[in-house]
């Protein structure tokens, strides 16, 4: 069967994979019903494009990274998400991709971005599931009997900072900091992407993001000599570009305000810096470190940081 699936005269395998990769980057596939691609599915919006990408994918040796590079370097992917009146009139659902779709990044990627930019992310590949920071309360209601009780054994050391791919996932409940994740009690082909106050509260208060902000603040403090350079470096690490327009002034203003807050409240500074298992550099003054931590946490929560624009 495997040989049959990958024979040159069997085009469906390549088309299905190409369509799913397209869905990953654009929010929906060239064939909208990615779970049912065939004679009963929706018709492709761009049939020739689907066929061409499928042939390219097959002839590249089924290399997924090559396919992804082809998609993300295309003019279609790199165009603006700004919607004009003409777009809304002629193609309100953007089926023809006259502009880029605007998507919130999946929570797994948001967590990995925070860990990567701060320098906490563990590069280890493979191994058993890990147990990153999670509140205990969601698990208590799942204990049917004492014998089947489950306590969450939080990981230690580098395992706390593994990629989200390796996070332990119980069938009846998804990790609570993974927004819109399926509970896996039913099969879901696509994850719904929503935006709610609960998501914002999580990213502002969850130890994962607070600790990442603290470590990022520590990192840029060591790497750069001035406030301006530190803020620019943190901005670039989180958003992948240099701050522009009014952004440098706004960041500097926030840092100044946070300095005043934590200079007047040493206990609040120490409490903020105590979040997370990683050790902080005590040579950095607490009020200064806390102020830059709060600023870095704001960077992680910017719309531009959580949205693919």
Residue ranges and their predicted role:
Residues 1-156, 161, 182-191, 204-287, ...:
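Primarily short, surface-exposed interaction patches in extracytoplasmic proteins
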Residues 163, 172-182:
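Active-site Gly/Thr loop motif
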Residues 295:
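Short, surface-exposed polybasic-aromatic patches that bind anionic ligands, especially phosphate groups
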């Amino acid at each position: 069967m495997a040989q049959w699936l990958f024979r040159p005269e069997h085009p469906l395998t390549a088309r299905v994979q190409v369509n799913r990769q397209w869905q990953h980057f654009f929010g929906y596939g060239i064939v909208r019903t990615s779970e049912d691609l065939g004679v009963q599915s929706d018709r492709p919006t761009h049939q020739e494009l689907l066929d061409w990408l499928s042939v390219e994918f097959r002839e590249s040796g089924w290399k997924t990274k090559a396919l992804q590079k082809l998609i993300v370097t295309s003019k279609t992917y790199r165009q603006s998400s700004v919607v004009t009146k003409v777009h809304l009139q002629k193609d309100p659902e953007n089926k023809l991709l006259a502009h880029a779709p605007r998507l919130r990044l999946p929570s797994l990627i948001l967590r990995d971005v925070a860990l990567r930019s701060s320098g906490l992310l563990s590069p280890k590949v493979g191994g058993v599931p890990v147990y990153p920071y999670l509140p205990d309360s969601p698990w208590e209601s799942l204990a049917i009997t004492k014998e089947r009780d489950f306590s969450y054994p939080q990981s230690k050391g580098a395992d706390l900072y593994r990629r989200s791919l390796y996070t332990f996932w119980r069938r009846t409940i998804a990790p609570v900091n993974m927004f819109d994740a399926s509970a896996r009690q039913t099969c879901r082909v696509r994850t719904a992407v929503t935006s709610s106050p609960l998501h914002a509260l999580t990213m502002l208060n969850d130890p994962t993001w607070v600790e990442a902000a603290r470590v990022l603040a520590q990192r840029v403090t060591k790497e750069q000599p001035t406030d301006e350079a530190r803020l620019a470096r943190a901005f670039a690490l989180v958003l992948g570009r240099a701050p522009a327009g009014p952004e440098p002034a706004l960041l500097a203003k926030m840092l100044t305000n946070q300095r005043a807050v934590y200079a007047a409240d040493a206990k609040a500074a120490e409490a903020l810096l105590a979040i997370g298992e990683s050790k902080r550099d005590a040579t950095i003054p607490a009020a200064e470190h806390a102020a830059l931590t709060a600023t870095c946490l704001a960077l992680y929560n910017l719309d531009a940081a959580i949205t693919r624009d």
